[in-house]
């Protein structure tokens, strides 16, 4: 649960303590991280969709980067489920971001990704009942 402002201050203090006061720090953006309990209804709805698709969920409680999930979670006060869906993509907001467009039966593509999002909306709207 790192606070971006607190972290910036700690980095500044560390640099100063080691004789690097001449190094400037320019914060371009600071976004808090987000986390969601696997017991949260949104997470359970997402897990249910993956299992219904025959996919064993891989759960990462935290990601190694900040980004839109943390921003919108803080801004709107909502729980955010990130990096979910059928298909393969990674690197959101980075120069090497990608998304598989056409699945090959082993890896889902854009159509499967979109359908899994629709399933997630239905699953969450009806949770804990069947969707």
Positions of PLM-derived features:
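Long hydrophobic segments that form regular secondary structure
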Residues: 1-3
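Short amphipathic alpha-helices in soluble, non-transmembrane regions
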Residues: 7-15
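Generic structural marker for isolated residues within well-ordered, non-membrane alpha-helices
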Residues: 12, 46-47, 69
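Short secondary-structure junctions
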Residues: 18-22, 50-56
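Flexible, glycine/charged-enriched surface loops at secondary-structure junctions
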Residues: 20-26, 126-131
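A short beta-alpha structural unit
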Residues: 23-39, 62-64
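Short, low-order "capping/linker" segments at domain edges
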Residues: 34-52
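Zn-dependent metallopeptidase/amidohydrolase metal-coordination segment
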Residues: 55-127
């Amino acid at each position: 649960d790192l606070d971006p402002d607190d972290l910036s201050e700690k980095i500044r203090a560390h640099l100063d303590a080691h004789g690097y006061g001449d190094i400037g720090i320019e914060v371009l953006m600071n976004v808090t991280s987000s986390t969601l309990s696997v017991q949260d209804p949104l997470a359970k709805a997402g897990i249910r969709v993956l299992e219904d698709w025959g996919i064993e969920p891989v759960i990462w409680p935290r990601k190694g980067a900040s980004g839109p999930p943390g921003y919108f979670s803080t801004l709107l006060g909502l729980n955010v489920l990130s990096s979910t869906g059928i298909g393969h993509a990674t690197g959101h907001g980075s120069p090497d971001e990608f998304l598989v467009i056409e699945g090959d039966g082993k890896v889902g593509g854009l159509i499967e990704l979109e359908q899994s999002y629709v399933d997630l909306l239905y699953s969450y709207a009806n949770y804990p009942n069947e969707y």
